[in-house]
Amino acid sequence: MEAFRTHTGIGVPLRRSNVDTDQIIPAVYLKRVTRTGFEDGLFAAWRNDPSFVLNLPPFDRGSVLVAGPDFGTGSSREHAVWALMDYGFRVVISSRFADIFRGNAGKAGLLAAEVNQNDVELIWKLIEQNPGLEITVNLQDRNIIAGTVMVPFTIDDYTAWRLLEGLDDIGLTLRKQSEIEDYERRRPSWKPRTLPV
């Protein structure tokens, strides 16, 4: 997983609340067994509407999604995070995230930046007044800069550390590879064991 320090990209105002994982990517798009190729399913039902924000330039090139409260509710669907990332999003800003979505996002490298709802409204206003506005999100300092406005965001320390280090679950496990190998060597021969690679 690529480490996340800062990201600057076009802000996309998604003025919707209670966006669940089925709206992010409908179940019909979940037939792949890989982690890539889900961008076509992102907001598929809404993208049929020509006036949907992702169909409008410059928002179609955005990488910082600014959404209403309760983003990512519904079923635990890693595909929702993968679809956002495949489309090009690196950050989702909202005043409230579903716990499962927040966890899946951090494990995959997508920053879920939680801000006050008044700050979401302010960022929406700035983006709509200046389409194409670039937003900079700094994970180290935990702030968002949109135009001349800077707002803080929250994220738990553990997820922030994983993102800063670029550690997904496999990366975390590989940090302990020598200890795992030592443990396997010491296990009694009558116990099940993994085969060497």
From Swiss-Prot:
Keywords from the named record: Amino-acid biosynthesis, Branched-chain amino acid biosynthesis, Leucine biosynthesis, Lyase
Pfam families for the chain: Aconitase_C (PF00694)
An annotated GO BP: L-leucine biosynthetic process
InterPro entries, sorted: 3-IsopropMal_deHydase_ssu, Aconitase/3IPM_dehydase_swvl, AconitaseA/IPMdHydase_ssu_swvl, IPMI_Swivel, LeuD
Pathway this chain belongs to: Amino-acid biosynthesis; L-leucine biosynthesis; L-leucine from 3-methyl-2-oxobutanoate: step 2/4
Catalysed reaction equations from the record: (2R,3S)-3-isopropylmalate = (2S)-2-isopropylmalate
Recorded GO MF terms: 3-isopropylmalate dehydratase activity
UniProt-listed Enzyme Commission number(s): 4.2.1.33
Gene Ontology cellular component list: 3-isopropylmalate dehydratase complex
The keyword Amino-acid biosynthesis belongs to this UniProt entry's keyword annotation: yes
Similarity comment text for this entry: Belongs to the LeuD family. LeuD type 1 subfamily.
Subunit (UniProt): Heterodimer of LeuC and LeuD.
Task of the protein: Catalyzes the isomerization between 2-isopropylmalate and 3-isopropylmalate, via the formation of 2-isopropylmaleate.
Name the record gives this protein: 3-isopropylmalate dehydratase small subunit
